[in-house]
Amino acid sequence: MINFSEKIYSKVKAIMDTWSESGIYAISFFVYSNEAYQYKNYSNISTFAISYNTEEDCEGADLYDEERWNYAFWRQDETPIIDPDEEPEMTALLFDWYKENGITDIGKEDDDCYDSNFNYIGKGPVGHYELLQIISEVASKLQSEGYVEQHFGKDIPIIIHGLEYAWYDIEATKKANPHGEADIFIKAMKELGMIP
């Protein structure tokens, strides 16, 4: 049985151990799928990279400003964890995990994924939501065991997201921060109208 969660945890923690820049106030777990992303005979696969933002990066933005919380304004200097081009071993392991768990049709999307008000209610392409669940477990473990607070000297949120903040990204972010570490992020995004 593949302990994929533990593999991701070890890789993420090893990278975060190298982060020593001052002023880090948020960690990005960027999980994104795109039809251009391909692995073997699959397309529209999900990738995963991590990064962070600092107070200096957001140039003194107020606590609830978009510049502080919207990833579009961040430095976006990601380190890939799962990527078919840059981290093929982890991508292969992900696909082995999919197979082991009976997840098929990777990358396919349901055409009926919007409600009557045209709100997206789908879970992304097949495999994306399942990967988000593992990543939120990893983030929650980092928070619950006190690693984030010990390493950075304070509680900071781990934000799980794509280019947009879909309902499942917000769900994953809430699970990832079990002690309310992301409450300010959630409130800011609601005030900005970026999430319902």
Residue spans for each PLM region:
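Well-ordered, non-membrane alpha-helical segments in soluble/globular domains
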Residues: M1-K13, G124-Q143
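Generic structural signal of hydrophobic/aromatic residues within well-ordered alpha-helices
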Residues: I8, V12, M90, L94, ...
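N-terminal interaction modules that seed assembly of large macromolecular complexes
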Residues: S20-D65
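Low-complexity, serine/threonine/proline-enriched polar segments
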Residues: E56-G127
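Short N-terminal edge-element motif at the start of the domain
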Residues: M1-Y32
